[in-house]
Structures are given as C-alpha cells and as structure tokens.
C-alpha cells in the first residue's frame, strides 16, 4: 500500500474492520474492548507508520450503525465505543511518531449512534456517510432532502454533534443519484 500510495502525495484514508478473522457480533466487541485484538491493530499502526503513511486518516468500524457489519453497534453501543477507543489508543501507542487522524464514522441511518461515541480524546474527526438515493419512499427530491437533513442521525444531527465537541466534520462516503 505504501509503495503505491506514498508517491501520489495524497493522504490515505482507510476503513479498518473493527473485528478480526471470524470474530463478529456483541461478543467480539466485548473481546475487543478487553484488548484481545490489540496486537492486530498495533501491527497495522506500525506497518502504516513504517511505510510512510503515519498521517493516514483511519475509520475503524465505519458505518457501525448498519446491521450488516460484523462490528455493528446496534445491540451493544457501549461495547463498540470501548473497543473503538481501545483500538485508537493501541494504534497511537504502537506508533508514537505517527499523526494518525481517527474519524468516527456512522452512516446516515438508525441506531444508537451517540451512545457509541468513544470520547473526544480519541476522536479527531466526526464523519458521516450519506447518500442521496431515491428509495421508493423518497422519490420526491424535496422530501428526500428533508430526510437527509432531519433524520435522527442526519446532516443537522451531524453538524450539531460535531460542533458540541469542537470537532471538524467529514463525509468519507457520499453520493447522489436518482
């Protein structure tokens, strides 16, 4: 990765699966929060830093409020937050000279998003993945835009949540369509 990316002069943004191997679900989140996977994330941190990617923007457990991901926080948001926190601390400790940027990144969707927040001291950026898609229930563009703005975890929520913590915002994944 470093050999391919470093010559571009651009900063790399990586989504990091928050569970490893065959681990998934609430039990895996608790195991991660207890440190079982620390060595995995420490190795990733060293590889990135040693490869000249110590300024990477990292998105551990992206879109954690989506049910389909093995690291979904829907059932245990506090275990997710503890695991995410531990991952960020382990990676920073493993590569102390790196300047990783940790982007906490829900999806515009449902779920206990705020309850899965790991803390201001480990989150550098508050991201939101948002897609302007015309699902059958949002064919009208104005209604669709209101949904994006006013959804429980929508654009207004994102703005207010980040501002309350003094954090910059990002949109790591976004798109528009019909």
Regions found by a protein language model. Give the residues of each.
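Extracytoplasmic, non-cytosolic globular domains
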Residues: 76-92, 98-105, 124, 154, ...
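Short catalytic/ligand-binding loop motif for oxyanion handling, primarily in non-cytosolic enzymes
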Residues: 21-24, 65-70, 109-111, 134-136, ...
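Alpha-helical scaffolding within the catalytic cores
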Residues: 2-3, 39-46, 106-118, 149-161
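Active-site beta-loop-alpha junctions enriched in small/polar residues
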Residues: 17-19, 61-63, 103-107, 131-133, ...
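Acidic/histidine-rich catalytic cores of soluble enzymes
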Residues: 102-112, 116-134
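Glycoside hydrolase catalytic-domain groove-lining segments
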Residues: 3-4, 121-177
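Short, surface-exposed loop/turn motifs that are enriched in glycine and acidic residues
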Residues: 77, 116, 144-148
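Substrate-binding cleft of extracellular glycoside hydrolase catalytic domains
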Residues: 2-102
